């Protein structure tokens, strides 16, 4: 098996998946499973790269012969905590597939391993006055900049969500209470979909965007790097004196404002479109701490 996780042979000669199958064969079928499940290409390549390294280290063992010590040895060669965590994620998914979906193993040799915790950085949200200066500078810059920054700062959209937003995702039936719908093409991310209440202010901003750019389909047909450049340009024009403001900073600021307004952990998970898992619970805990009343 190559480092991409692809078996160097034709599909017709790949044997069926069974307990005595080589690791390389199991990786081939796992890759097929991920592809059919609609996983992102980069995710599949990352998983299979780690699994190919694991296969090279454990060859010629069959999957039924793999033990916890094989997992420990592979993880122990990780040079950083982030590499160890990524490798464990790759192995965990692989063995969950073999035990659960494929049902060729009865025991997961990786189940008693846990990732080393990687501390989450405390965000530096924008204060209310900074937010107003930023939006004023965005309005002076362009209709596109104004709409983009407003959506990230006032509704907490991520950069990726901003770039997939379309004209038919904006409901202006009531201009005093517009609704912005966040959709995902990949079925795996349906849980992140949501609809967010905007304001009459956004209706005005949106109408200006339509007038100046007449978008056909995508509201922001630009590259991710272009969003970063817009934010950098507007931050400089606003004279905030900070060089650490990114699209994520705007989303963080929204989340902290929501926490100040009374949002709890469940509410933050929902409005931010996050998966309900322990890591994200820890993440929104940072917003709750920053949004709590001062001591």
Model features per residue range: what roles?
Residues 44, 91, 148-149, 156, ...:
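Alpha-helix N-cap/helix-start motif at helix boundaries, enriched for small hydrophobics
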Residues 164-204:
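Conserved tyrosine-mediated DNA breakage-rejoining catalytic core shared by Y-recombinases
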Residues 130-159:
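Basic, Lys/Arg- and aromatic-enriched nucleic-acid-binding interface segment
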Residues 28-121:
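N-terminal core-binding DNA-recognition domain of tyrosine recombinases/integrases
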Residues 117-133, 189-200, 215:
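DNA breakage-rejoining catalytic core of tyrosine-based enzymes
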Residues 214-216, 232-270, 274-277, 289, ...:
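Short, basic (Lys/Arg/His-rich) helix/loop patches that form interaction surfaces
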Residues 197-242, 254:
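Active-site/catalytic core of tyrosine-dependent DNA strand-transfer enzymes
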Residues 1-36:
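N-terminal DNA-binding module of tyrosine recombinases/phage integrases
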């Amino acid at each position: 098996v190559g480092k991409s996780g692809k078996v160097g042979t034709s599909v017709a000669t790949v044997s069926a998946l069974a307990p005595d199958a080589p690791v390389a064969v199991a990786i081939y079928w796992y890759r097929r499973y991920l592809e059919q499940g609609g996983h992102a290409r980069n995710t599949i390549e990352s998983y299979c790269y780690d699994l190919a390294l694991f296969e090279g280290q454990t060859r010629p063992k069959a999957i039924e012969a793999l033990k916890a010590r094989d997992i420990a040895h592979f993880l122990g060669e990780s040079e950083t905590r982030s590499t160890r965590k990524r490798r464990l994620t790759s192995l965990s998914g692989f063995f969950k597939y073999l035990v659960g979906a494929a049902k060729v193993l009865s025991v997961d040799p990786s189940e008693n391993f846990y990732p080393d915790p990687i501390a989450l950085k405390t965000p530096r949200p924008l204060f209310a006055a900074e937010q107003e200066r930023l939006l004023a500078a965005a309005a002076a810059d362009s209709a596109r900049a104004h709409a983009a920054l407003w959506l990230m700062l006032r509704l907490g959209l991520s950069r990726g969500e901003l770039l997939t937003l379309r004209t038919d995702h904006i409901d202006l039936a009531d201009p005093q209470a517009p609704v912005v719908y966040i959709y995902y093409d990949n079925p795996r991310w349906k849980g992140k979909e949501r609809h967010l209440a905007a304001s009459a202010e956004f209706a005005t901003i949106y109408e200006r965007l339509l007038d100046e750019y007449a978008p056909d389909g995508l509201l922001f047909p630009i590259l991710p790097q272009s969003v970063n450049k817009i934010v950098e340009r507007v931050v400089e024009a606003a004279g905030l004196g900070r060089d650490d403001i990114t699209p994520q900073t705007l989303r963080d600021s929204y989340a902290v404002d929501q926490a100040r307004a009374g949002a709890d952990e469940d509410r933050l998970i929902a409005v931010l479109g996050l998966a309900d898992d322990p890591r994200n619970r820890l993440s929104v805990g940072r917003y709750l701490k920053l949004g709590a009343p001062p001591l």
